[in-house]
C-alpha cells in the first residue's frame, strides 16, 4: 500500500519556491523537500503499522498546508536560473608569489571572508570550510548548492548560494536567513545591518530588509551586475556601464563611468573600488562619485581588495597574477598565484588571502620583505593542506527541543502570526516586545517559543538580531 502527496510553496512576491513530497509505503514514510527543480533532501522513518505511518504523514502534510503549501503537479515549475562566473584562466608568467599555505577545498571557490580568528572559504560543491590564519581546518558546513559569496555583517557571517537562499553561518548549524525571489539570477550580494542587497544578470539591484521583505529594486543602465556593496550611505552597484550609488530608499545619488565592465567591487570607509574587464581598478569617493584613483593591470580584473582605508590596493586578473598598488596608483609588484586566477580576495595583517579557479584558499605573505625576497627567487616553504575526514554539518530546518529554560539561560522569543507573515518577538523581560527579531525563516512556527543564546539590538536600533544557538521550547 503506497500513496504520495506532493506540495509546493510559491509566495506571491517570489520569496520562496519550495516543494514537499510525502510518500507512504506500507509502514515507511519518506519525505523529500527542497527548492523546486532540485533533488532536495530525503528523510525516512518506519512505524509499527500502516495506520501509524498514515497518521504521521497526515500530520506532516497538515503542518505544511498551514504554512501555505498547496497540492501541485510535480515538474510544472522549473529550477531557478543560475549563472556562474566563468574565467578562462591562463598561467602567469610573473615571478611566483610568496605563498605561506594553500588549502584545497575540492572545487572552484568563490566565497571568502577573513575574520579576526578564522578564514572562511566556500566552493561550487556547497562546502564552506573554516580555518585558522595558519591554515588549520577547524570546521565544515554543507550547503545545498554552490556558494556565490561569503559576507560579514558585524558579528554575523552569511553565505549566498545558487539555490537563492542566504545562510547564516553564525551557529553550529547553517540556517536560512533570506530567500531571494525566483526571477533574480544572482550575481553577487552584500548585507549591512540586516539589509540585503542583491545584484543580478539583468543589471538590477534589489534590496530586502531584515525580515526578508522586499524594499525596492532599480533597473540599471547596463547588465551583468557583479558588484553590490551595502553601507550606511546606501548601496553601491557596479555593472557593464559603471558604478551607481543609491540611497537607502533607492534614489540615485550619483553614477560614474568605468573603463570596461565592472567585474568586482570592494569598499572602504570613504571609497568604493571597481575592478573592470579592461584591466582597471577605479577608486571612487563615496560622497560624490569622483574618481580618486586609477590602478592599471595587464588583463581583466576579476577581484580586488585593499588594506585598511585603501593605503594599498590589490587586484587579481584572469592570467593567475596578483598586483599591489600604492594609493596614488604606483604599481608596487605583480606576482603569480601558482594556483589559478583569483575569484575573490581579502587582505588582513600583511597577508593576502585568495580563493581561486582551482579551488584553493591561498595565503600570501604580502609584507614588503617577503615580496622583495620573492622577486629575488627566495620563497617560503609552502604548506599544502587538505580537508581530511572532518564532518560536514548540513544546513537543516530541524531544531533541538528542550523542556524549559533555566534561569539566566538565554533569551526566549515567540513566533506570532501577523497577517500573512510569521513574526518573532522577544518575550523575556528587559526587551521591547513591539520590536521584531531577525530569525531563521524556515523554523518559524506560529505559537512556538524558542530559546536563543543571545539577542542584540541592530545597529540602526529598530529591531533585534539573534546570536548563537537556537532551541525550541516544548
Per-region residue spans from a language model:
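Beta-strand-rich domains and repeat architectures in extracellular enzymes and scaffolds
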Residues: 100-126
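Beta-strand/loop nucleic-acid-binding surfaces
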Residues: 429-445
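Blade-level signature of beta-propeller repeat domains, shared across WD40, Kelch, NHL, RCC1
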Residues: 339-387
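Repeated scaffold domains used in trafficking and secretory/extracellular systems
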Residues: 107-113, 145-154, 184-191, 223-230, ...
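A short helix->beta-strand "capping" segment at the edge of beta-propeller domains
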Residues: 85-107
Amino acid at each position: 500500500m503506497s500513496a504520495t502527496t506532493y506540495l509546493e510553496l510559491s509566495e506571491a512576491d517570489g520569496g520562496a519556491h519550495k516543494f514537499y513530497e510525502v510518500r507512504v509505503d506500507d509502514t515507511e514514510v519518506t519525505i523529500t523537500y527542497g527548492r523546486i527543480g532540485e533533488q532536495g533532501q530525503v528523510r525516512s522513518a518506519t512505524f509499527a503499522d500502516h495506520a501509524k505511518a498514515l497518521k504521521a504523514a497526515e500530520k506532516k502534510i497538515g503542518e505544511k498546508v498551514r504554512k501555505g503549501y498547496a497540492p501541485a503537479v510535480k515538474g510544472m515549475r522549473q529550477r531557478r536560473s543560475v549563472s556562474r562566473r566563468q574565467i578562462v584562466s591562463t598561467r602567469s608568467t610573473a615571478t611566483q608569489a610568496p605563498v605561506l599555505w594553500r588549502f584545497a577545498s575540492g572545487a572552484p571557490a568563490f566565497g571568502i571572508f577573513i575574520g579576526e580568528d578564522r578564514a572562511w572559504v566556500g566552493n561550487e560543491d556547497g562546502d564552506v570550510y573554516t580555518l585558522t590564519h595558519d591554515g588549520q581546518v577547524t570546521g565544515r558546513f554543507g550547503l545545498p548548492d554552490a556558494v556565490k559569496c561569503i559576507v560579514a555583517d558585524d558579528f554575523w557571517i552569511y553565505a549566498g548560494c545558487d539555490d537563492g537562499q542566504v545562510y547564516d553561518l553564525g551557529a553550529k548549524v547553517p540556517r536560512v536567513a533570506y530567500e531571494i525571489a525566483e526571477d533574480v539570477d544572482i550575481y553577487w550580494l552584500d548585507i549591512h545591518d540586516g539589509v540585503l542587497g542583491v545584484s543580478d544578470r539583468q543589471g538590477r539591484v534589489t534590496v530586502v530588509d531584515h525580515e526578508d521583505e522586499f524594499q525596492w529594486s532599480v533597473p540599471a543602465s547596463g547588465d551583468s551586475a557583479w558588484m553590490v556593496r551595502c553601507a550606511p550611505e546606501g548601496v553601491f552597484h557596479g555593472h557593464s556601464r559603471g558604478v551607481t550609488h543609491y540611497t537607502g530608499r533607492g534614489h540615485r545619488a550619483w553614477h560614474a563611468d568605468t573603463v570596461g565592465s565592472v567585474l568586482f567591487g570592494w569598499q572602504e570607509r570613504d571609497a568604493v573600488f571597481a575592478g573592470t574587464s579592461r584591466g582597471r581598478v577605479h577608486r571612487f569617493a563615496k560622497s560624490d562619485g569622483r574618481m580618486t584613483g586609477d590602478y592599471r593591470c595587464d588583463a581583466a580584473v576579476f577581484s580586488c581588495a585593499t588594506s585598511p582605508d585603501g593605503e594599498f590596493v590589490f587586484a587579481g586578473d584572469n592570467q593567475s597574477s596578483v598586483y599591489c598598488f600604492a594609493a596614488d596608483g604606483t604599481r608596487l609588484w605583480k606576482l603569480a598565484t601558482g594556483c589559478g586566477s583569483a575569484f575573490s580576495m581579502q587582505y588582513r595583517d600583511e597577508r593576502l588571502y585568495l580563493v581561486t579557479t582551482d579551488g584553493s584558499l591561498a595565503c600570501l605573505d604580502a609584507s614588503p620583505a617577503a615580496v622583495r625576497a620573492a622577486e629575488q627567487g627566495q620563497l617560503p616553504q609552502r604548506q599544502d593542506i587538505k580537508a581530511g575526514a572532518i564532518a560536514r554539518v548540513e544546513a537543516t530546518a530541524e531544531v533541538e527541543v528542550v523542556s524549559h529554560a533555566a534561569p539566566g539561560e538565554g533569551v526566549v522569543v515567540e513566533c506570532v502570526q501577523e497577517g500573512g507573515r510569521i513574526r518573532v518577538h522577544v518575550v523575556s523581560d528587559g526587551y521591547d516586545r513591539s520590536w521584531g527579531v531577525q530569525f531563521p525563516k524556515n523554523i518559524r512556527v506560529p505559537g512556538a517559543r524558542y530559546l536563543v543564546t543571545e539577542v542584540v539590538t541592530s545597529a540602526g536600533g529598530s529591531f533585534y538580531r539573534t546570536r548563537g544557538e537556537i532551541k525550541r521550547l516544548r
